[in-house]
Amino acid sequence: MDIFRHTFGNNDDSFIRIPGAFREEPPADLNGRTEDQNSNTNEPTQSRDGRLKSILHFLFQAPLIVLYYLLNFIVRSSRLLKPLLRLHGFYQRKHNRLLDHSSQLHRLLENLENEAQAVTCSEGNGNNDDGSNTDSTSNNESSGVQFSFGSLYNPENGTFSKSIMQNSYTELLDACSEQVKFGVIYLHDPLLDNHMDYVNKILCSEAFVNMIRKYQVLLWYGDVTTSEGLQVSNALKIRQYPLLGIISLKAEKKIELIARVEGSISNYKAQDLEAIFSKNYSRLIQLRQQRQNIEMQRLIRQQQDSRYQDSLRRDQQRESERLEQTQREQMEREHQRIENQWLLWRKSQLKPEPSSDKDASKVAIRLENGQRLVRKFDASLPTEEIYAFVELQLHDMLNSENDTLPVYQPANYQHQYSFKLITPVPRRELDLSTKISDVSGIYPSGNIVMERLDE
């Protein structure tokens, strides 16, 4: 609070009178009045200034005090909430790990493997203390321990690692339905005194291992102290623990619990379990054959449909090609008809050969087959007249008698010559629109060579 007092308080230095000192006379002003007389005069003004300063002091001091305590509260609250948030995050991560069946399974199998090794070591040490190797062998045979738990059920390199369902109980049901196989459920209770009896005397026994191999059984392990293990236990209506249950596909996509061993290990008999597997295995074989037959029929239908679609596609392609060929032939015939009509019309428009040499051009035309034609043309006509003459000669229409009937020029048809006419010296192609008289190579006379255009 000293800072507020220093900010808004009186800036005058405090004065303490020394005891026994003489009374100091107040100094007089220029008019001869003392300070007391002046103070009496200025007292109303100082009173107003003091009240104004007090009001300003209160207005500025109160918000700053509130802000100070508010910031102090926020800082202290954040320090208290930080450990709580860390604790909440820890329990949240732990809860998420517990919900993951894969992590639960790995932890359960690891614990069972360690405890099984501990039991084996303790039994071996006890037998060595007694000095009897024969008793150790007899105890192992009586207990039925033929394999180590880790060599069988280790999720990474165990014999049955691929048969153990890594995910939820629902995955086991789906796998049994899709693959048409038996499923074995083992619910472990670590709170029991003899909770390792099932592990050592059943799960690791030679008889049980042989049954798992023979019938290609899928395995699912759970812990009743977890939420999923407890849900499975309630769904199967288990009364005692541990549980060894067998599920099988009884009908299409209908899974049933066909056998169970609960509680004391004395309730377990390997021959009874073998009888249950053997009895229901024939039913699974039938279901597998039905599935295979259905799948085979589906594949046959699929192949038939595929062959039918291929045949239909080939027929459609052949029909499409036939239609295209027909259309091309029709278009070619129509084009040939129009071209013949144009040739007849062009023959009717062809000017006769001039009788005199005046204003005429005498040219010698050599065709592609070596034939040589000599003819006179009117020099005032364009060179297209020579092109038309050669075209009619190639179609053998100059000497035909089909020009007796009137022929009209085809509408919307522009004839394209399939050759070009060239003067050899100098070598130059004749332009269709140029007058014959303007071409020095053929007027008044000259030679022309016909060449086919590249298609």
From Swiss-Prot:
Q: Which Gene3D superfamilies match?
A: Glutaredoxin, Phosphatidylinositol 3-kinase Catalytic Subunit, Chain A, domain 1
Care to name a GO molecular-function term for this sequence? ubiquitin binding
Q: What protein is this chain from?
A: UBX domain-containing protein 3
Lineage from the top down?
Eukaryota, Fungi, Dikarya, Ascomycota, Saccharomycotina
Q: Name one GO cellular component term.
A: Dsc E3 ubiquitin ligase complex
* Subcellular location(s) per record: Cytoplasm
User: Coding gene?
Assistant: UBX3
Record the organism: Saccharomyces cerevisiae (strain ATCC 204508 / S288c) (Baker's yeast)
Q: Where is the UBX domain?
A: 356-455
Quaternary assembly: Component of the DSC E3 ligase complexes composed of at least TUL1, DSC2, DSC3, UBX3, CDC48 as well as VLD1 for the vacuole-localized complex or GLD1 for the Golgi/endosome-localized complex. Interacts with CDC48.
Anything else of interest in the record?
Present with 233 molecules/cell in log phase SD medium.
